[in-house]
Amino acid sequence: MEEGFRDRAAFIRGAKDIAKEVKKHATKKVVKGLDRVQDEYSRRSYSRFEEEDDDDDFPAPADGYYRGEGAQDEEEGGASSDATEGHDEDDEIYEGEYQGIPRAESGGKGERMADGAPLAGVRGGLGDGEGPPGGRGEAQRRKEREELAQQYEAILRECGHGRFQWTLYFVLGLALMADGVEVFVVGFVLPSAEKDMCLSDSNKGMLGLIVYLGMMVGAFLWGGLADRLGRRQCLLISLSVNSVFAFFSSFVQGYGTFLFCRLLSGVGIGGSIPIVFSYFSEFLAQEKRGEHLSWLCMFWMIGGVYAAAMAWAIIPHYGWSFQMGSAYQFHSWRVFVLVCAFPSVFAIGALTTQPESPRFFLENGKHDEAWMVLKQVHDTNMRAKGHPERVFSVTHIKTIHQEDELIEIQSDTGAWYQRWGVRALSLGGQVWGNFLSCFGPEYRRITLMMMGVWFTMSFSYYGLTVWFPDMIRHLQAVDYAARTKVFPGERVEHVTFNFTLENQIHRGGQYFNDKFIGLRLKSVSFEDSLFEECYFEDVTSSNTFFRNCTFINTVFYNTDLFEYKFVNSRLVNSTFLHNKEGCPLDVTGTGEGAYMVYFVSFLGTLAVLPGNIVSALLMDKIGRLRMLAGSSVMSCVSCFFLSFGNSESAMIALLCLFGGVSIASWNALDVLTVELYPSDKRTTAFGFLNALCKLAAVLGISIFTSFVGITKAAPILFASAALALGSSLALKLPETRGQVLQ
């Protein structure tokens, strides 16, 4: 009985094994047939199948095949559980699934790299087995990077340009749009916020400059970290910092807290430009890079248009506000600040669906992660083009040999803050060392010349773009003053004034027993006048002064006529009752001037659209240097037309002209910066140069605006000289058109 049971169990197990082998052979033949059809595209080898076929031609002996190799297997054979029935440990894994990246030693004689060349025994990362790391010279590392750059370019060509790149284009475009919005936010809210926060001229100037200071710090900080921690991760963190503090700034009431929030908001958005361009460039093949990086620049313009349109639509709506007593006020300009944080928030949400740069993975020795991302790029593009059957043929990618730089801290070593402190110091040292390497012998000349180009471009561009609106406001003020009405020597008795007085000067007037009730005074001046037995009630004023006037037996009830508005005036037996609360400073508030700021900014940013299109179409045809130098020369020539801008409309037209011709040089400079530095220094160098750009912007704005109302010759001369110097330096830089990404 027992012997019959064993024979039956052996028979069943043998039948299962035979069925399993038949299934494996059938699956193998089908997969091999499909792969051979795809062989022309993928250049895949079939050495794995050949080796297995050789083994299958000689089956194991009966005892070994059915019963296993040892007695233990024989004893346990009949007790196999039903839970494992049907489980096939040798089932063929589908060819397209990720099984771990094949290495050189497992590929056999037919394995090839992305460029079609045999691996020739390469194992692991580049340089493995070539001796100790200490003996590796800089020349060897340079050779490794050149080989990686060539292979990476070939892989990007195989992946193609399609849906993946366009999706990433719009995602990173939102991040760049957030940067464009940030530049305009403070300028748009100042006319409204100055009254809520009672801002003096010095406070307004500091608020305008603090954004550039934050962006300068952020560009250097996030640019350096992105080369060590990753492009995607640092961009997510920087955008999160920007959106959080932009949100807080719309609710805080005090000037100091608002200034602090806008500073940290600027620090967050400062990482946008250096990371976005580096990140996107590492997914673009050489023939597409210049054009599509230029198209990406268009989102900065869209950010400016968005900010101007939202300011125009939201800020004048005073009904969009509420207040809780006199301590907390939420006016429409705060809604505008909140809306301006939306691009950053949307960019964060969209960026979470995107992978890290595969080039960053390869630079840090993460071969498998890079392969997976590149396969995702390939498969996404092939499916979108209607070729889902095409297989990603790359089996091995070169990686850079990694130096032992990181300090590993055990979890039980000291307190948590001590471990984090050591890690932060180590990371800071690596970032600083990477920054200093940009001034090493190999890159010193390029870095110094790029500093000159970035500084001169930013000094002239930001200086002029802020000087233009200030000049327009100055011309408006001159025209407004020319229409001032003067009323000399008037005598008024027993009259009630309950209307608006605007842009008037009253000299030597005498007012007896007059009532000023519900009166609004705008840009009104009373000089050498007498007020006797008069009554002021519910009077509001802006830019209104009483100079050398005398008030006798006069009552002021619920007015905003504060002490500083009485210049060298005498008040005899006069009383102030229940003065208006709020800002004692004289602010103009919103009005036609604010609308003009929105309109001019809207036209100025929209005017760069033709320049963006032209630069994108010609960037890869005429080269980066010609585009940069040519656009700078045209901008320099356009500066001389500023001397003819003697009217408001003429200055607006010249602003649009300057913005339209100068944008091409910015696009070329962004592309050139990306391509001149290797991947391990790209965002560090870009971040440093962008930080220098913000410093030059602060200097340019401060210098150019100081000449408003004095002379136009100095700004024209400074801008022309800076642009001429920048274009001459640009011509000495190496041309990067047609080169692979380092």
UniProtKB/Swiss-Prot annotation:
CDD domains: MFS_SV2A (cd17439). Residues 1-57 are annotated as: Interaction with SYT1. The chain crosses the membrane at residues 170-190, 206-226, 234-254, 263-283, 295-315, 335-355, 448-468, 599-619, 627-647, 652-672, 686-708, 713-731. Belongs to the major facilitator superfamily. It comes from the Eukaryota. Plays a role in the control of regulated secretion in neural and endocrine cells, enhancing selectively low-frequency neurotransmission. Positively regulates vesicle fusion by maintaining the readily releasable pool of secretory vesicles. It is found in: Presynapse; Cytoplasmic vesicle, Secretory vesicle, Synaptic vesicle membrane. This is Synaptic vesicle glycoprotein 2A. The modification Phosphotyrosine is found at Y480. Residues 32-144 are annotated as: Disordered. The modification Phosphoserine is found at S80, S81, S393. Residues 1-169, 227-233, 284-294, 356-447, 620-626, 673-685, 732-742 are cytoplasmic.
